[in-house]
Regions:
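RNase H-like nuclease fold core
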Residues: 1-76, 80, 84-92, 160, ...
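Short acidic, glycine/Ser/Thr-rich loop/turn "cap" segments at secondary-structure junctions
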Residues: 39-43, 66-70, 104, 120-127, ...
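Short helix/loop capping segments that flank catalytic or ligand/cofactor-binding pockets
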Residues: 23-24, 83-84, 109, 165-166, ...
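A detector of single, family-specific signature residues
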Residues: 34, 45-54, 59-65, 90, ...
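Conserved beta-strand -> loop -> alpha-helix junction used to position metal-binding or nucleic-acid-contacting
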Residues: 72-80, 85-124
Length: 252
């Protein structure tokens, strides 16, 4: 897992997530090819999702051939260390889709329980608009409404809001949102790893944890299927291509 080459495929999406595994943090990388195949790219064992460790991890993956020739979409939650590492390794202009589920749950966590279900529905309805401008206006209305209700919740919604609308801005939310608006693709992998290792309650060494996690990941990978929206992936490829062309012309 940690040594396999990745230059035998054409890559389009990178998903990143950190999960607690046997009291340690495991940061996992999952790639999606232009034809929709999912593949594990690697993992790193760390105490926290800090920028230095995550950047070194991403560079190592890139050195093994993980390159988005037509551009790359990166999907992650709001972890600042991971976010900063992605910008450092893949550039300031790489499009990042922040997980809408994490954003929604972070916002409602500031609200009284009696209001949380209502606000989950409001946020979900706003994000469901496939048009970027319509979704953005709906979310900005919710920001203004939240300022009257709970300033902390409003600030939480505003933080990184544009990155939760990346698929909308690229014009592919209706076609690809089901697969890439959240980090669910990679979180489901870790959930299955936990199922396979839940009975192991004693770890002699840190290396043993890494080996067990890697073995479980490889077992899970054998059951991978293509992403549901694989037939629409050319739309994302073209959108990323267009974005790169516009940016290169602007820089010329």
């Amino acid at each position: 897992l940690q040594e396999r080459r990745h230059d035998d495929a054409e890559w389009l999406v990178l998903l990143l997530d950190g999960k607690t595994f046997a009291a340690d943090q495991m940061v996992l990388a999952l790639g999606v090819t232009v034809t929709g195949e999912k593949r594990l790219l690697g993992m790193v064992q760390t105490a926290t999702e800090n920028k230095r460790v995550c950047a070194a991890f991403l560079r190592e993956i890139a050195e093994r051939g993980f390159v988005g020739a037509d551009g790359l979409l990166v999907v992650l939650d709001g972890a600042k260390g991971l976010h900063a590492a992605v910008r450092e390794v893949f550039g300031e202009d790489v499009p990042i889709q922040r997980c809408q589920w994490h954003k929604r749950e972070n916002v409602v966590s500031y609200l009284p329980k009696a209001l949380q279900a209502t606000w989950r529905g409001k946020l979900q309805a706003a994000y469901a608009h496939p048009d970027y401008a319509v979704a953005q206006r709906a979310l900005q209305r919710l920001v203004r409404e939240l300022r009257l209700l709970n300033a902390s919740a409003a600030r939480s919604l505003e933080e990184g809001l544009e990155e939760t609308l990346t698929l909308h801005r690229l014009g592919v939310f209706a076609a690809l949102g089901t697969s890439f608006k959240t980090t669910n693709l990679i979180e489901s992998v870790m959930a299955r790893v936990e199922e396979k290792t839940v009975r192991v309650d004693h770890w002699r060494t840190s290396d043993q944890k890494l080996r067990w996690c890697a073995a479980a990941l490889l077992a899970v990978e054998k059951q991978f299927r293509r992403v549901r929206c694989f037939r629409q992936l050319p739309l994302l490829q073209q959108a990323l291509r267009t974005k790169m062309t516009v940016e290169s012309r602007a820089a010329a």
